[in-house]
Swiss-Prot record:
Record bears the keyword Ribosomal protein: yes
Cellular component, GO, one term: cytosolic large ribosomal subunit
UniProt subcellular location: Cytoplasm; Nucleus; Nucleus, Nucleolus
Entries under InterPro entries matching the protein: KOW (IPR005824), Rib_uL2_dom2 (IPR014722), Ribosomal_uL24_CS (IPR005825), Ribosomal_uL24_euk/arc (IPR005756), Ribosomal_uL24_KOW (IPR041988), Translation_prot_SH3-like_sf (IPR008991)
Chief localization: cytoplasm
Function: Component of the ribosome, a large ribonucleoprotein complex responsible for the synthesis of proteins in the cell. The small ribosomal subunit (SSU) binds messenger RNAs (mRNAs) and translates the encoded message by selecting cognate aminoacyl-transfer RNA (tRNA) molecules. The large subunit (LSU) contains the ribosomal catalytic site termed the peptidyl transferase center (PTC), which catalyzes the formation of peptide bonds, thereby polymerizing the amino acids delivered by tRNAs into a polypeptide chain.
GO biological process, one term: cytoplasmic translation
Species this chain originates from: Schizosaccharomyces pombe (strain 972 / ATCC 24843) (Fission yeast)
GO molecular function, one term: RNA binding
Name of the gene: rpl26
Assembly: Component of the large ribosomal subunit (LSU). Mature yeast ribosomes consist of a small (40S) and a large (60S) subunit. The 40S small subunit contains 1 molecule of ribosomal RNA (18S rRNA) and at least 33 different proteins. The large 60S subunit contains 3 rRNA molecules (25S, 5.8S and 5S rRNA) and at least 46 different proteins.
PANTHER family from the UniProt entry: 60S RIBOSOMAL PROTEIN L26 FAMILY MEMBER (PTHR11143)
One Pfam match: Ribosomal_L26
Protein name: Large ribosomal subunit protein uL24
């Protein structure tokens, strides 16, 4: 049963919208929840991830790993995190991409725009 006549419930159209999304929309799709401490401090639940945020992986084979985001790979919907790597066949290390939904933000990289975003979402910046 459809709840809204304005939003399609077609799987085909939802997948097209997701995988054909422009970078500006992918930024919002790549949001992650804040840790409980940050949630109490800023009074918001989640934010789009960005480079230099500190995160903890909470799902998958890399569960428990912590580190700083070195790159947000929007084209593939992945985060590259320092110290989350694997060894290649030739002995070199390669970063492992982690999905934004599998992490929790533990420390925010705050600048003027980020503070404005938190206030706009109804949170508090101290």
């Amino acid at each position: 049963m459809k709840f809204s006549r304005d939003v399609t419930s077609s799987r085909r159209k939802q997948r097209k919208a997701h995988f054909g999304a422009p970078s500006s929309v992918r930024r919002v799709l790549m949001s992650a929840p804040l840790s409980k401490e940050l949630r109490e401090q800023y009074k918001i639940r989640s934010l789009p991830v960005r480079r230099d945020d500190q995160i903890t992986v909470i799902r998958g084979s890399n569960k428990g790993r912590e580190g700083k985001i070195t790159s947000v790979y929007r084209k593939k919907f992945l985060l590259l995190i320092e110290r989350v790597t694997r060894e290649k066949a030739n002995g070199a290390s390669a970063p492992v991409g982690i999905d934004a939904s599998k992490v929790v933000i533990t420390k925010l990289h705050l600048d003027k725009d980020r503070k404005d975003l938190i206030v706009r979402k109804g949170g508090k910046v101290e």
